[in-house]
From Swiss-Prot:
Major localization listed first in the record, in broad terms: membrane
Species name: Vibrio parahaemolyticus serotype O3:K6 (strain RIMD 2210633)
Protein name stated in the entry: Sodium-type flagellar protein MotY
Annotated Gene Ontology cellular component terms: cell outer membrane; plasma membrane
UniProt entry tagged with the keyword Chaperone: no
Signal peptide: 1-21
């Protein structure tokens, strides 16, 4: 991070592409206005929001996934009219005027889109807020070429909500919808019991379904190996399918969102002439559908 040995009082003139001082608009919550709110706190998503008066909202979000992730969006009441180069600077708070400003990075905000920052830079913004500083976005006003816009995030009342946000991230599920949307599970060689690994996978699916109100369809298809005759295989397959229907209903899913089908020993995916092939054929395929928002 490069340090600019300047105070916040002269930031606007030095950020200008011209050699002369420019007028600027600055959007920031006063200490009395500053709010941070956890608007989503579930095992699937965490969202921390900071309203910026007369401008919009600063939104940090993280979602259930194999990897820890963080997105930052600067949601604007009025979208960008033109694409602009943006300087992201860490500014001292008003009560520490003698401190220097630190350049964090340069970005682009694109026409008709909210501002977006991801990855390490988004984590860096949180880090600056935790230090009590004001991360500030500065760019040329697309409506007035001789004017710059400054949008700052206030660190007032940030820490307690940030602690809650950090706790939420730590408790996110370690898999996403895409990881479980199509799953093949396998049964033990005798009876209706899933293998140990399959039981663990089914429990993961259950955790996701419990916390996601957008799951609107569960498709279950069960298959057997060729050990039994056609009638016995079909009966076993249907029994397994109905058992899973009951399981998903116990999670709170309406009956009309669950479709199950037993196929018996039809549609093998491996050679039933070997134990390994039979193990692969004794399976259930679970597909999830959800409403996209």
């Amino acid at each position: 991070m490069n340090k600019w040995l300047i105070t916040s009082g002269v930031m606007l003139s030095l950020l200008s592409a011209n050699s002369y001082a420019v007028m600027g608009k600055r959007y920031v919550a006063t200490p009395q206005q500053s709010q941070w709110e956890m608007v989503v706190n579930t095992p699937l998503e965490c969202q921390l929001v900071h309203p910026i008066p007369s401008f919009g909202d600063a939104v940090f979000s993280s979602r259930a996934s194999k990897k820890i992730n963080l997105d930052f969006e600067l949601k604007m009441r009025r979208p960008m009219g033109e694409t602009r180069n943006v300087s992201l600077i860490s500014m001292p708070p008003p009560w520490r005027p003698g401190e220097h400003a630190d350049r964090i990075t340069n970005l682009k905000f694109f026409k008709q889109f909210d501002g977006y920052v991801g990855g390490q830079t988004a984590w860096g913004i949180l880090s600056e807020l935790e230090k009590g500083r004001y991360p500030t976005f500065s760019y040329q006003d697309w409506q007035s070429r001789d004017q710059r816009i400054e949008v700052a995030l206030s660190s007032v009342l940030f820490q307690s909500k940030y602690n809650a946000f950090s706790d939420c991230i730590a408790n996110l599920l370690k898999y996403s919808f895409e990881d479980i949307a199509f799953t093949i599970l396998h049964y033990e060689r005798q009876g209706d019991q899933l293998t140990k690994a399959s039981k663990k996978r089914l429990a993961q699916i259950a955790d996701y379904v419990r916390h996601n109100q957008d799951i609107d369809l569960v498709l279950v298809a069960t298959y057997t190996d060729s050990t039994d005759g056609k009638s016995e295989s079909q009966s076993l397959s249907e029994r397994r399918a109905e058992s899973l229907r009951t399981y998903f209903e116990s999670l709170g899913l309406p009956e009309d969102r669950i479709q199950v089908q037993g196929y018996g020993k039809r549609r093998p995916i491996a050679d039933n002439g070997t134990p390994i092939g039979k193990d692969k054929n004794r399976r259930v395929v679970i597909s999830l559908g959800r409403t996209q928002v």
